């Protein structure tokens, strides 16, 4: 009886959030460091539940550690410059193979196996339908591009058909040449183009920490201005800066809220979006909690 009462209380707490976000777009970015078979299954269940209550969920994934692993298995050495992967033509082929041919297919398969009836997830590369048009970064990085345009209608049409897009972040220039795109930046660009209500980054950290060495120092809420100040004063871990900057830019460009949560915690997405306390860090443009 106690368990049943607790379950009822959880559902009652979730109801206002379900009503508020029904019909709204939610962009979920899954980092390569948070990819794990059991966690992917829990994430699939979360995505399906959010979809079932009317949210329009788009999943964007990275895969850096998996690309590194494949490169080493092929006798190649990963190279980075200012946190970005130097992407030669040979490296680009490995990136496409891992992101599009392996991780994307695995995530789509996991979601569809968890679906109660017919499959609902569909894999999409940024190359498909001109979803991500990119311009090259500096030539020393090779085939690394910045998103210059998002054709959000590609995703909107899939969502309108009741499908859940799973996006791998390979884009192409206007001539059709593929480029490697930073997944955090691609997720931000897609969320802004879609007019998303929320963008959620699932990471291998609890969220933004006041003290990077203390996982109990989680910052639960802050504004984009406060976030920029922390980045400027280098009071955050260096590896989090691209995600933090993407969050601030997203909310400043019209996304309702940005969230950084611990993707290692099963069902972290539901806890963050459908409970009062949440589980990670939430960023808004204005301080109207």
Where are these regions (language model features)?
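Nucleotide/pyrophosphate-binding catalytic subdomain
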Residues: 1-264, 271-273, 277, 285-289
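A residue-level signal for beta-strand positions that form part of recognition/binding surfaces
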Residues: 280
